[in-house]
Amino acid sequence: MKRSLWIAKVIAMIIIPSIWLMCINAWAQEIRYITPEALKELVEKDDDTILIVDTQPKAAYKMGHIKRAINFPWTPEIKNPADLPRDRILVLYCDCTNEEDSIDMAKQLLRNLEYVYVRVLKGGWSQWQKLGYPTEKNSD
């Protein structure tokens, strides 16, 4: 009986901290959003602590994108994020109904590639355009 109790205590000492750590990791990797209004302010200030990332295909990016955005198209598995610095806040956006591509890319960056500063633009490209915020086009 004492041995069974001792084994149960040891198992509890191992399992409880593991569950606690899993919960903390899940919370830490929660997707965070930025509003179009907040991003517009940062764009207007030429804030270089952010990097705006258009996750749409290159053709869509060329047709129009948020001012100062770079193009890093969504892919099911990010292989080489060398163009995405770790020391800046990455603001991801797409033209999906519920920001699916941006959310997926954010999850990949946070969970698989251990990025820390990642945000998703609430409402995405369509909301940005609807509000009439600054855009630009590339012809290359």
Label the predicted regions.
Residues K2-I34, I50, K62-I89, N98-D140:
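Rhodanese-like catalytic fold shared by cysteine-dependent sulfurtransferases
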Residues E37-D47:
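A short acidic-Thr-Gly-centered motif at the start of a beta-strand
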Residues I52-D54:
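Structural scaffold elements adjacent to functional motifs in cytosolic proteins
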